[in-house]
Amino acid sequence: MPAHRMLHAHPLSADLFASFGSVIEIGNKTGRPVNQGRAQRIKGTRDLAHAAGAAPVVDLYQVETSKLPFTVDCLERHPLSCQIFTPMRCARYLVIVAPTGADDKPDLAHALAFIGSGEQAICYGAGVWHAPMVALDDIVVMTMTMWEFGDARDCEEFWLAPDHGLVVQP
């Protein structure tokens, strides 16, 4: 008998996401004036952890639309770099994360799901297990920023058993 774990997707917030990385958004934050007073510089994130010798990469992701409920079949992590996704064209997207268990695999019993908006960027901390990007409502275009070596060290994948996966509900 299948034993899927059902996750309820919560609105993405900095507090709920803090143990996995950071949410970068204006929200109700105030900044400091820059550019002769024509702009506000609002603090985003300063935790841009990456291994020495890794090269900075900025790529574009165009993500096809998925529907809820969504079945997660794979989680990945980037042990040597944080990874930032910044919306360029986006309504909503799904963020699925899991802490690392004692066996160094994702702890699926404590996985969480969030729904982010087009006004929220996310920074996964280095080594954080997460699902690949999932677009809701429409195609999503994001920039992805991280540091890479260009080999297998950059990404580890964990495939979930088909009958013991995660299903995200609205």
Where are these regions (language model features)?
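His/acidic/aromatic-lined binding-pocket segments of jelly-roll/cupin-type domains
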Residues: Q83-T86, A121-I122, M133
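Ligand-binding loop in jelly-roll beta-barrel domains
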Residues: G127-T143
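Conserved metal-binding segment of the jelly-roll/cupin
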Residues: I115-W129
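Non-catalytic, conserved peripheral segments adjacent to functional cores
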Residues: M1-A113, D137, G150-R153, F158-W159, ...
